[in-house]
Amino acid sequence: MTAAVAEDRRGHADAPVILRLTDVHSYYGNIHALQGISLEVRAGEIVTLLGANGAGKTTTLRTIHGLLRAREGKIEFDGKDITQMPAHEHVSHGIGQAPEGRRIFSRMTVMENLQMGGYSRKDKAGLPDDYKRVFELFPRLEERKGQHGGTLSGGEQQMLAIGRALMTRPKVLMLDEPSMGLSPILVEQIFAIIQDINRQGTTILLVEQNALMALDAADRGYVLETGRIVLTDAADKLKTNDEVRKTYLGE
């Protein structure tokens, strides 16, 4: 099923497409990592990318963000061709990311990490409101705002990574494996917050190994295998797809 046909459960079919990839190819050296990826994300959606390790999920996010240059194809964001845009310019255009492994600044405090998230912002007057928003989403970060990032628990570091990305005021927030290494209770908390962030108006592109949790949160999903999209549909329909249930849901 094509991306244009798959409709999500919350009726975003008529929302504008904010992110579109068309026949995108990218490489690690001579390794052809993405082999003609085409997908779209509409404003207000949560869209998830599913697949086994090495399928190309993280590579897709890296290519969108300009950390890995697309050799072929086109990437459009908010109506603008960003295929060749340098990675450092993506943040100011509205693309935020909490990367795999969190990558917080371990020797900086929680507050300093958040300040780094807002460093490139031109509207400095809006920063206090965004600190407040992050602390409302993650009260534990406010309790630990003077603590060094490296001393936080895994769950707290994930909260900080997401909070730092939110300080850029992204139109689209890309999350790479937010549940990695977390207890089931913390995973539920993180995903509840992800849905809160989405309800507040941020579009989300999610990579997540916990396929059931991802599909429960998402509107639509894409299944990747060896650098290609092999299936896309509404999240509810993917959950009942026999192949998805057998391969990714352990049924």
Predicted regions and their residues:
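Glycine-rich phosphate-binding loops of nucleotide-dependent enzymes
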Residues: 2-251
